[in-house]
Regions:
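Interfacial helix-cap and linker-helix signal at transmembrane-aqueous boundaries
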Residues: 11, 16, 86-96, 293-294, ...
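Glycine-rich segments within core transmembrane alpha-helices of 12-TM secondary carriers
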Residues: 66-91, 104-115, 276-283, 378-394
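C-terminal ends and interior cores of transmembrane alpha-helices
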Residues: 1-27, 312-333
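Helical-face signature of the major facilitator-like transporter fold
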Residues: 36-40, 238-242, 344-349
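Cytoplasmic membrane-interface "Motif A"-like loop-to-helix N-cap segments
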Residues: 1-3, 296-315
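Loop-to-transmembrane helix entry
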Residues: 64-71, 189-200, 228, 261-285, ...
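Intracellular loop-helix junctions on the cytosolic face of multi-pass helical membrane proteins
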Residues: 60, 88-253, 257-263, 295-300, ...
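Intracellular juxtamembrane helix-capping segments at the cytosolic ends
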Residues: 45-59, 353-367
Length: 428
């Protein structure tokens, strides 16, 4: 991921006097897609494995597991809070000109390197002890490509499954480059909505992984298969939640830019990207509160089950969307007071804390040990599916050249319908 961020900052070489503006411009687009490929692959290694890694520090039925994942989630959001107020502020700084965002990407790369150094320090000093090792190291180190003798035995050097995984990963970069370059073009128009080749791949992948987990479940105990069924069911529930929650990065950000009074006394006007730091700031402040609440309810033997926490979280998410049309009642020339945006983010964050860390903990608890990383990857696929579904909603909020008053009417209608839709699905 660090390489990806530094590649995103590629146009900054012009600041060093390297290359002509024409050559840099010609390479900008291919370098951008290569950078995205590196980020995608890095994220694929990082997100499911770091979450699975945290789960290895707790015994199977430890009551500390959920609280540990809450703290882990708080750590994630410390970074999520710093990103928009640093990289976002730099990217929208008019004094940095056309390369402003590239400075932000470079700063993100430096942050990735610092995180890697901290992790390497933990490995070298034994902080992690023996947690996180492969459940089947013999298979991982088995040779899959080498010379054989007359007995069919591998001899000499060769490539292990572990090495092949790393080599194959880098070979995927041109594949991702092609998919990002050409796979996003619309192919189908079902129900008047655009579906690209990438969208079709995502739907196919969801179907394949459900098929694979169902087949795998038949090779283990009935109890283990039942646990996989729970994960698969909650996968779709999670996708529903994130479909609406992730509008924060699209429709809600456009709403913030177009229809929110962003002026703060003594600070001036904030950028819309800086409001992306509100959600992680709430998480940092509220995680200790949630840990106390769940601990208290458990002690009283009335702690909600994981599915019930999911339902509570989704109800809070739906209520958050009603803050937008209510704020519209107090609008002045189409500009809504900032407090209503902050209330919406607060309710969304409360809902997120009822679902996301609970879901991560649940997956590490229920998934078979041999495939916990794979199942965690499947779990994160719900977020990908949500982004795909969310884009159809975001398209309905395209303000275009509308005035703030006209745009506010559009947003109020969409957000009201989203709030009703979320709570209707809860009833079902």
């Amino acid at each position: 991921m660090a390489l990806g961020h530094f590649t995103m900052a590629f146009p900054l070489i012009s600041e060093l006097g390297i290359g002509s503006p024409e050559s840099i411009h010609a390479l900008a687009e291919p370098m951008f897609f290569i950078a995205l490929g590196l980020l995608i692959l890095g994220n694929g290694f990082f997100k499911p494995n770091i979450s699975s890694f945290v789960g290895t520090f707790y015994k199977q039925n430890s009551e500390l597991r959920d609280r540990g994942f809450n703290l882990f989630y708080m750590g994630i959001n410390i970074g999520a809070f710093l990103a928009p107020i640093t990289c976002g502020a730099i990217g929208q700084d008019p004094n940095l000109g056309v390369n402003a965002w590239h400075y932000g990407f470079g700063l993100a790369g430096i942050g990735m390197v610092l995180g890697l150094l901290v992790f390497m320090y933990g490995l070298r000093t034994g902080v992690f002890k023996n947690n996180g090792h492969s459940p089947n190291p013999k298979l991982l180190n088995a040779k899959i490509a080498a010379l054989r003798n007359e007995k069919g035995e591998y001899v000499g050097g060769g490539m292990t499954l572990k090495t092949a995984t790393y080599v194959g990963t880098f070979l995927l970069i041109p594949v991702i480059f092609f998919l990002l370059s050409f796979g996003s073009k619309p192919l189908l128009y079902p129900w008047g909505k655009e579906l690209s080749f990438l969208d079709i791949i995502l739907f196919s992948m969801v179907g394949y992984m459900i098929y694979y987990l169902s087949r795998y479940g038949k090779t283990i105990t009935k109890a283990g298969y039942d646990k996989l069924k729970v994960i698969m069911l909650l996968f779709f529930y999670s996708a529903l939640f994130w479909t609406f929650f992730e509008l924060a990065g699209s429709a809600i950000t456009v709403y913030t830019e177009t229809n929110v009074n962003k002026t703060v006394p003594y600070l001036g006007e904030l950028s819309s990207s800086q409001f992306m730091g509100v959600n992680p700031l709430y998480i940092i402040l509220l995680v200790p509160v949630f840990n106390y609440i769940w601990k208290y309810l458990k002690r009283k033997k009335i702690e909600p089950s994981a599915p019930m926490k999911f339902a509570i979280g989704t109800i809070l998410l739906g209520l958050g969307f009603f803050a937008f049309p209510i704020g519209g009642l107090f609008a002045d020339a189409g500009m809504v007071p900032m407090v209503f945006l902050l209330i919406a983010y607060l309710l969304h964050t409360l809902g997120e804390l009822c679902l996301s860390p609970v879901g991560l903990s649940l997956v590490t608890k229920l998934a078979p040990k041999q495939i916990v990383g794979f199942v965690m990857g499947f779990w994160f696929l719900s977020s990908s599916l949500a982004h795909l579904l969310g884009k159809f909603i975001a398209q309905e909020t395209d303000a275009g050249d509308l005035s703030p008053v006209e745009a506010l009417e559009t947003f109020n209608g969409v957000f009201t319908n989203v709030g009703l839709m979320v709570n209707h699905n809860i009833d079902n």
